[in-house]
Structures are given as structure tokens and as C-alpha cells.
């Protein structure tokens, strides 16, 4: 099972999708409507694509023997979703590439995999250094489209139960890091 979130090249590679589809023809692809076209263009068999709506919380896909999955729309600069995954015993929440998780509920899940792209102080320092050097700064857009570590921690504190765990994803790597 491959769950897709959005079209950006660091999350979806058509050549990889094509290769996976050929090497594993029984593989299922779970996605929202905005990823169907790119999957089909990559050569994935439409009979293997499960389209799940992120706008209806009752819409979920059951993958027998594996998990129940449900997407939830999250804001980004292209259509994007987070995934709620339940394997019969444990709940997982997965979200990257969003400026906010405000309004998203995932109370007391077992594992949270969410981005913590930057710290606010680091982002501001990079913006100021680029301004001073007269360079283009993409950092403002990054702040709108990616969770800061502070935002991620605040959301986690509101959601986590006593046994919950988390993994930070999509962390900014500077030059040489």
C-alpha cells in the first residue's frame, strides 16, 4: 500500500510510481482526487488506485489485513492531505507540508509523524541574512507552507496521550547539513 499526499516532487516521483507499479502489480495506491491524474499519467493501473475523499470524515478505505486509512485535507500551496491510519490496534497520524494543523483532531494516537521544518528563530535568522546580502529568500513561503518545530510541538501537546510517541519529519537541512 502506498498512500500519497500531494504532487510536489519530494513526495511524488512519476518514475518511481511507474517502476513500483511494474515491479509490484498488485500494489494498492491510496490517494485523494488530485493525485489520480498524476498516477495514471505515470502508468499506474487505474484498477489499483483507491480514491478517498478528504472532505468526508466517514470516507475511509479498509485494506483487509492491513489498516483502515482516512485522509484529511490540510492547507498547502497545492492540494494536500494528512493520513489517519488504524491497523486494528494502533493509530498513526501522518502529516507533512502544511502551514497549520489547526482544527485537525487526532487525540491520543499511538504515533504522530509530522513535520517540524524549522524553528522560528532559525527561519528569521536565515531571512535576515538573505535580506542583508540582497538575496532572494524563500523562507517567507516556507513559513506559510511548513510547520515550525514550535507549531508542531504545540499541536502535539494538545493531541498526545500519556503513551503517545512522535517522530519529526521534513526537517530543514541547511547547506552542508
Predicted regions located by residue number:
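Active-site metal-binding loops of divalent metal-dependent hydrolases
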Residues: 6-7, 34, 73-77, 96-100, ...
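Short, charged/polar "capping" segments at the starts of alpha-helices
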Residues: 34-41, 174-177
Amino acid at each position: 500500500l502506498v498512500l500519497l499526499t500531494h504532487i510536489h516532487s519530494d513526495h511524488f516521483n512519476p518514475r518511481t510510481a511507474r517502476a513500483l507499479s511494474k515491479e509490484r502489480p498488485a500494489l494498492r495506491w491510496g490517494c485523494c482526487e488530485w493525485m489520480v491524474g498524476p498516477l495514471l499519467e505515470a502508468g499506474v493501473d487505474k484498477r489499483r488506485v483507491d480514491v478517498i475523499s478528504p472532505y468526508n470524515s466517514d470516507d475511509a478505505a479498509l485494506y483487509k489485513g492491513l489498516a483502515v486509512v482516512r485522509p484529511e485535507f490540510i492547507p498547502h500551496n497545492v492540494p494536500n492531505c494528512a493520513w489517519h491510519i488504524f491497523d486494528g490496534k494502533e493509530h498513526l497520524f501522518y502529516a507533512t507540508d502544511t502551514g497549520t494543523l489547526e482544527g485537525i483532531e487526532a487525540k491520543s494516537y499511538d504515533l504522530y509523524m509530522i513535520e517540524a521544518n524549522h524553528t522560528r528563530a532559525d527561519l528569521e535568522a536565515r531571512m535576515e541574512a538573505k535580506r542583508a546580502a540582497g538575496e532572494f529568500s524563500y523562507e517567507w513561503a516556507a513559513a506559510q507552507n511548513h510547520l515550525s518545530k514550535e507549531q508542531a510541538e504545540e499541536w502535539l501537546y494538545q493531541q498526545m496521550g500519556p503513551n503517545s510517541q512522535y517522530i519529526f519529519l521534513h526537517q530543514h537541512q541547511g547547506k552542508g547539513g
